[in-house]
Amino acid sequence: MASGSSSLMWFRKGLRIHDNPALEYAARGSDYLYPVFVIDPHYMEPDPNAFSSGSRRAGLNRIRFLLESLVDLDLNLQKLGSRLLVLNGEPSEVLFRCLKEWNIKKLCFEFDTEPYYQALDNKVKKYATAAGIEIFSPVSHTLFNPADIIQKNGGRPPLSYQSFVKLAGEPSWASSPISTELTSLPPVGSVGSCPISEVPTIENLGYEDTEEDDRTPFKGGESEALRRMRESIANKEWVANFEKPKGDPSSLVKPATTVLSPYLKFGCLSSRYFYQCIQEVQRNVKRHTFPPVSLLGQLLWRDFFYTVAFGTPNFDQMKENRICKQIPWKNDDDLLRAWRDARTGFPWIDAIMIQLQKWGWMHHLARHCVACFLTRGDLFVHWEKGRDVFERLLIDSDWSINNANWLWLSCSSFFYQYNRIYSPISFGKKYDPNGNFIRHFLPILKVVDHDLASKECKQILYEAYQLNKRLNGKVSEEDLKSLGRKPEEDKKQEQKSKRLKQTLLS
C-alpha cells in the first residue's frame, strides 16, 4: 500500500495519451498513479468451439490489434514516467482488490455506452462510492454526450441523421484546444500482492499464432493511429473532396478510406482531436464537402449511431426493439455458413468475405454488398446472424455502429428502400472489372467472369451452389407485407433477380 494520495486510471477503450480527460484528472494532484488494464476473460479467453480462432466474442485479428495497442500504450506511459499494469480476471473483482490494497482515493475511467460496460461500471461505481472513493468518468469516446442529445429530444434518441445534427449543433469544445499535452505522470506506487503482468502475447493467452498472410495488415496503437491520421490530413485536397459513399471497395495497395475506424473503436485516436484536425483543413481550403457525405460527416454518423444505440432498449436485437421492423427472416444456418465461409459461389461476395477473414476489415461499400446479399438482397437470412459474424471478425467491430449498420442494410431500421439492392455481380463488375481484387483473395480462380460464375468457381464452390439452388429468387408476399410494402412495387426487381439466379445456377 502506498502512502499519499493514490489514483487508479482504468483503461478499457481510450487507449491513448492525447485527449484523455480521465487520465489527466487521475494524474492531477496525485502522488501515485496506477494505470490499469484488465484482461477480461469475457473477451479474451480462447473458445475452441468458435468458427474461427479467437475468444467467444472476438476473432484473433482484433485480439492481436488490442494487444498491439496495449504495448504501444505502455511504451507511451513509460515515456511519461509511468507504466501499464496488466491484471487478469473478472474486471470488477480485480478492481475491488486493487482499490482496497492500493488505498485508492480517486478512480477514473472513460464513460462507455455499451450495455456490458454500463452494467459493469454501475457495479464498480457502487463499490467505490461505498468505500468513499471519488469517481470521474467523462464522455470522451464520442463528440457529444449521448445523454445530452436524448434529453434535448424529449427523452428519446433522434432517429434521423438530420434531426441528430440539428440537435447536436457545434461541439462546445470545437473552437478551443481539447487538452493540454501531458509531459509527465505521477509514479506507480507499490502494487503489493496484486498479480501484475506485462502485456501478454497471443501465445500467452493460449492461442496459436497465424501465418503472416492471415493477419490484418493494420497495426494497433496510438502511435500508428496518429501517423495514419496525419498522413490522411496532409492530403488537404482529398480531405476537402471526401464524399461518402464514393470510393473504391476493391483498392488493395492503398485503401480508399482512412482506415481509422479500428483506432477510433479502441480509442487509440480521439474522435474529438480528429474532428478538430478536419476542421483546420476545411478552414484553409476554398471549398469542401459537407455532412452527411464529408469526412467530418462520418464522425457525426458515428455519434448519431452511438446516441440511438444508447437510448434504444434491445438495440442489438429484432425482438422488443421498438425501432426495428419485425421481419420473418430465415434461420437457415447452411446459407449462413456458406456466406460466412466464402462458399456462396459468387466470386465478388466470396472475395470480400475472405478479406474479412484475413484482414478483419473491408471498405464500407464491400460491407454493404455482403450484408445486403445475406439479408434482403438474396439469402433473406436474419441480420442478427450476419451481425454476429462481423462482430467477431472485424478489427473495428463497434457494438453501436455494427448493430446500426445491420439494421440499416437489412432495411430493418433507418432505411426502408427495400428494392435498392447491391447486385453480387454488377457491383463487382463495376469496381473490379479485371478481377484483380477477386483473384487476390481467391487466387485459385484463374479467370473471373462477372456475368456468369466460371465453371472452375462452380466446381470449387459446389456446395454453396447447391444451397443457392434452394432459393426462389424473390421474397414472398407475406415477407413484403411485413416490410409495409406492396408486392407489385417489387415485381420488376423480383423478376430480374429470379432470371439472374436461374442463369447463374443452371
Residue ranges and their predicted role:
Residues 55-62, 66, 218, 341, ...:
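Residue-level preference for long, well-ordered alpha-helices that form the structural scaffold
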Residues 253-439:
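Active-site-proximal binding-pocket segments
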Residues 98, 108, 127, 136, ...:
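Generic recognition of cysteine residues
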Residues 22, 69, 73, 225-232, ...:
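Alpha-helical packing segments of well-folded alpha/beta enzyme cores
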Residues 154-325, 428, 432-506:
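Glycine/tryptophan-enriched, flexible segments
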Residues 1-183, 291, 354, 389, ...:
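Trp/Phe/Arg-rich N-terminal binding region typifying the photolyase-homology
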Residues 112, 411, 444:
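Short, loop-centered acidic/histidine patches that primarily coordinate divalent metals
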